[in-house]
Amino acid sequence: MNKSYENSGRFGRFGGQYVPETVMTALMELEESFNKAKEDSKFIDEYMYYLQEYSGRPTPLYYAENLTKNLGGAKIYLKREDLNHTGAHKINNVLGQILLAKRMGKKKVIAETGAGQHGVAVATGAAMFQMECVIYMGEEDCRRQSLNVLRMKILGAKVVSVESGTKTLKDAVNEALRKWVENIEDTFYVMGSVVGPHPYPTMVRDFQRIIGDETKEQILKKEGKLPNYIIACVGGGSNSMGIFYPFVEDKSVKLIGVEAAGLGVDTDKHAASMAKGSVGVLHGMMTYLIQDDEGQILPVYSVSAGLDYPGVGPEHAYLKDTKRAEYTYVTDQEALDAFGYLSRCEGIIPALESSHALAYTMKLAPELSKEEIVVVNISGRGDKDVDTISELNIFG
């Protein structure tokens, strides 16, 4: 599972454990449990069982024939993470972490959520494994994603609306971490992305790499060769890290992460921490952040609630610095256009997050030859976004 660039919780200069002493004990306990679990065939078998029987894996790698024909360039395949139980890639990681929580004897799980997809996945897993569940969500995100708030409550979770700061994902993470520190003995913090202090970025990636492992097997079966490009959206970066990781050493495969440019990267309304950020520390890790000269985190914005995080996973920061992956961005408008385009051209309504990856693909594919292959990670379905779309009144 390990690549040579990992060094005790760091990816080059990124990552680490910038946390108070009270949290270090819990992180050490977590790391030890995770390291034992991933070498235990019984744990791996149980994890794979639930991925298949409960979540419905493997997800298809679908040849988007209409999209390919309309754009007139490379062959486009869609990795259909939207077809997972709960409608996104988040469940891959949640099932792994909740199984780990059970193994560690924890009674309660807590989590943060932005778009609500991770919260729904945690509430789902907690219901299945009969564990108490509390989800922290920014007040602004609760408003934008009211459907997911209701889903979490139906599943038996308590949803706490966080009213501090910008009332979005960053503030939800802060509150969840604070509560975890207060209840470390019996509580497991289910981190939703490849962010936070070590071992979370590594652990979440290892639970998400199933996306890339399946993609590699599927594309070789369908095409007899690896793709030329893999494209995925990046907020914290777990769907992208999950599909990128098994291809990191396949140098012929170009890895492209797409951030949210919001109203434009030259405005103060975006969430492109790779394009416009600088290195700093947030939520226990060193990475690229959107911050001022004093190191204060600045407000971020995206039409997509799952991408408005002011940082990025440390492994992504490392892949950027070493030029193994390329990071770009698209605006709200481009993502909304792609959302409508895929819906009408393939009958697949993608999440607004995934629509960012799709928007960049729509720019790139026409410039490529018909022999080239592009895989786009459709990280989630767009049902959760119909409220947002309705407010924007785009489709009448």
Swiss-Prot record:
This is Tryptophan synthase beta chain. Pathway: Amino-acid biosynthesis; L-tryptophan biosynthesis; L-tryptophan from chorismate: step 5/5. Its cofactor is pyridoxal 5'-phosphate. It is an enzyme of class 4 (lyase). InterPro entries: Trp_synth_b_CS (IPR006653), Trp_synth_beta (IPR006654), Trp_synth_beta/beta-like (IPR023026), TrpB-like_PALP (IPR001926), TrpB-like_PALP_sf (IPR036052). Belongs to the TrpB family. The gene is trpB. It catalyses: (1S,2R)-1-C-(indol-3-yl)glycerol 3-phosphate + L-serine = D-glyceraldehyde 3-phosphate + L-tryptophan + H2O. It comes from Clostridium kluyveri (strain ATCC 8527 / DSM 555 / NBRC 12016 / NCIMB 10680 / K1). One of its GO terms (molecular function) is tryptophan synthase activity. Its EC number is 4.2.1.20. The beta subunit is responsible for the synthesis of L-tryptophan from indole and L-serine. One of its GO terms (cellular component) is cytoplasm. CDD domains: Trp-synth_B. Pfam families: PALP.
